[in-house]
């Protein structure tokens, strides 16, 4: 048996985070939401009115940003903390959606986050989801999954997620933001969203969350036992 890293990449709204959380739980692995790290940066920049086009401001802000993870035993889930404060709906708001891809495309920010992510993966036994996990962060990961889904279905999922938090957003606005983010993610110069050559594609459009998790866990267990 071998300890491995499971890298799950894909577009926003494909169910990466929900799937990755449950895969980690099923394997007894640590779950790291890399996208939430960039969302924490975006939230901090909005709150403190940081101009992400100015490198000196960005560098100074990054020095003040502490991102950490903890496991909540009562809720049986992983939580992300920004400067020791648990982040939840704050980093999923439309205002964060609008700028997170632009922030993630900045080389200074990207390098800082990737360096932190690589340190988190030193112990292996981890599931990390994002957009460049299998290509940049952990190119040697034993299992790489690339998730896709229909844009309208992704928009409905995001709308439901926001409504459950009491936030009402028009689905067309969500669809517009997702399409814009898809384009920014796929075409940015720094760590673009592309499928790794050895990644397995998983279209989640018409799969239940349980189906997605089972497919990945079955593959992961086979790799772990063969290792």
Please name every model-derived segment:
Residues 88-165:
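ATP-dependent NMP and nucleoside kinases share a basic, alpha-helical "lid"
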Residues 14:
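ATP-binding Walker
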Residues 26-92:
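N-terminal phosphate/diphosphate-binding loop that engages ATP/GTP or pyrophosphate donors
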Residues 17:
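Walker A/P-loop
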Residues 6-8:
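Hydrophobic anchor at the beta1->P-loop junction of P-loop NTPases
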Residues 61, 72, 117-124, 131, ...:
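Small-molecule kinase domains that catalyze NTP-dependent phosphoryl transfer to phosphate-bearing small molecules
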Residues 11:
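P-loop (Walker A) phosphate-binding loop of NTP-binding proteins
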